[in-house]
From Swiss-Prot:
GO biological process terms held by the UniProt record: DNA recombination; double-strand break repair
Name of the molecule in the record: DNA repair protein RecO
CC per GO annotation: bacterial nucleoid
Superkingdom of this protein's organism: Bacteria
Pfam families membership: RecO_C, RecO_N
Gene: recO
Family designation: Belongs to the RecO family.
Organism for this UniProt entry: Methylobacterium nodulans (strain LMG 21967 / CNCM I-2342 / ORS 2060)
NCBIfam families hit by this protein: reco (TIGR00613)
Keyword Repeat: no
Record keywords, A-Z: DNA damage, DNA recombination, DNA repair
Entry-linked SUPFAM superfamilies: ArfGap/RecO-like zinc finger, Nucleic acid-binding proteins
Amino acid sequence: MQWSDEGLVLGARRHGETSVVLELMTAGHGRHLGLVHGGRSRRMQPVLQPGNRVRAVWRARLDEGLGHFAVEPIESAAGRLMGSRLALYGLAHAAALLRLLPERDPHPSLYAAAQVLVAHLTDPAIAPALMVRFELAVLADLGFGLDLSACAATGSNAYLAYVSPKSGRAVSAAAGEPWRDRLLALPDFLVAREAGGTGATPTPRDVRQGFTLTGYFLDQHVWHPRGVAPPEARELFVALGTADAG
């Protein structure tokens, strides 16, 4: 068995004296592991750092085997990311989110979204809002996507302001007002223009509301059912990314 693909390095763990088991999020083959002979060498260690984009050839006798990777660098982002605490926490959290996916299950749209996220992780004006959208995308690919297109009560797409914690569907400002204390806030940057969104740059408060929204559904549908706690990296990333939210 053999295939070639590009991938984002999620991590690597030591295997023996000279090798590593490399974990990639690939464009066409999903999250995939493989052995890299000589992965601990001086030449290969910089290539296999989390956040880097690589070209990988995977070979194995049987499709279900661990197999071996031959890896070449495409883009080295690790050096840039290491200089930013926000980026390091964001990268760790993004990797934890991708590990929620079944191994070897292709998710090409999430791979593309992860590349965009990694490219902007060092920018505090962009990265937090991108992470909220990335969490929404992970929820959708796990089968728990939110419907933010129209009001669950009226069917209208005008002035959407809330999300029902039960259905995961948007609710308009007027329809939700009597029950606002029971609903989750829908920040403006997640509302389409045709549904009343302004298109304005999200404020730290908007982003915090976004993380509250995604965090609720991740906990309800993913973390709690699997018996795992939210990643500490998420908490640290949210704290840094919304520091001015008050």
